[in-house]
């Protein structure tokens, strides 16, 4: 006499399915954490920055210098933006054509103002949010007879938040100068985030440039930086004390 095979109850099948789903989610989450940890951007404390272009203009004691500082919002935070960090609903706040148009207009305004030193923040080099447009290269051509330097402060292979996610980030700050710099360097600032949030967040820095002042043995030092926009003050004070 053969015994009949026992049938699994619907409840057991249900719990098994739930277990498999939870296991898949856990494995995917662990894989994501491992990926963003392994690909985390870890800049040195101090890094020498390459100088692009070739300016021959010097500076001497008593000269007047015109300066401009501009957070361009990676060419995508114009009057049409509905950005989630400002209480809006969108991650991608502009079309690709709008970003291109904005960067072109920004370059035009820099040429019009013609500053000796232009410090720009939130400049994307290869980011999903600005359609991977190399804004550094385009803005670096804004003025003839100038040079520029770029310091990265946000690099992540994949930023998993919000929904839809930000994705790839490669952004920073840049300085365009008519004055010939004898050096430029990136100096890291303290990171206010802990692991794992730190792995996909900004690594803020100072972009420090130096130009010799003729006949004095001294230097003109100009520092570009971009601090927290959504900080209540503690993080900014910590970095300024640094």
Regions found by a protein language model. Name each.
Residues 72-75, 124-126, 154-156, 179-182, ...:
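Short, solvent-exposed loop/turn segments at secondary-structure junctions
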Residues 8-161, 165-170, 237-240:
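N-terminal, active-site-proximal structural segment of metallo-dependent hydrolase catalytic domains
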Residues 179-220:
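Active-site catalytic loop in hydrolytic enzyme cores
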Residues 66, 135, 170-174, 203-207, ...:
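Short beta-strand micro-motifs in enzyme catalytic cores
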Residues 89-95, 123-125, 189-199, 227-237:
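Surface-exposed cleft-lining segments at the edges of enzyme active sites
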Residues 141-144, 167-184, 211-212:
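Conserved beta strand-loop-helix elements of the APE1-like EEP
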Residues 80-89, 183, 223-228:
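Short, basic/glycine-rich phosphate-binding loops at helix/coil junctions
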Residues 215-242:
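Flexible, glycine-rich surface segments
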């Amino acid at each position: 006499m053969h015994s009949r095979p026992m049938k699994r109850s619907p409840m057991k099948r249900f719990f098994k399915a739930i277990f498999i789903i939870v296991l898949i989610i856990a494995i995917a989450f662990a894989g994501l954490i491992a990926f963003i940890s392994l690909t985390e951007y870890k800049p040195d404390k101090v890094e020498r920055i390459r100088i692009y272009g070739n300016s021959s203009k010097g500076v001497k004691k008593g000269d007047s210098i015109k300066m401009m500082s501009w957070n361009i919002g990676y060419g995508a935070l114009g009057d049409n933006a509905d950005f989630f960090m400002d209480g809006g609903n969108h991650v991608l706040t502009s079309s690709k054509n709008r970003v291109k148009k904005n960067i072109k207009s920004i370059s035009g305004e820099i040429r019009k103002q013609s500053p000796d030193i232009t410090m720009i923040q939130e400049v994307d080099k290869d980011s999903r949010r600005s359609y991977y447009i190399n804004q550094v290269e385009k803005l670096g051509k804004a003025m003839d007879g100038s040079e520029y330097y770029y310091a990265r402060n946000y690099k992540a292979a994949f930023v998993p938040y919000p929904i839809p996610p930000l994705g790839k980030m490669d952004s920073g700050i840049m300085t365009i100068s008519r004055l010939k710099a004898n050096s430029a360097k990136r100096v890291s600032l303290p990171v206010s985030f802990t692991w794992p949030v730190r792995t996909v967040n900004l690594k803020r820095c100072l972009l420090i440039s130096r130009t010799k002042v003729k006949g004095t043995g001294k230097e003109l030092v100009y520092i570009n930086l971009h601090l927290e926009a959504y900080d209540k003050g503690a993080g900014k004070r910590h970095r300024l004390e640094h």
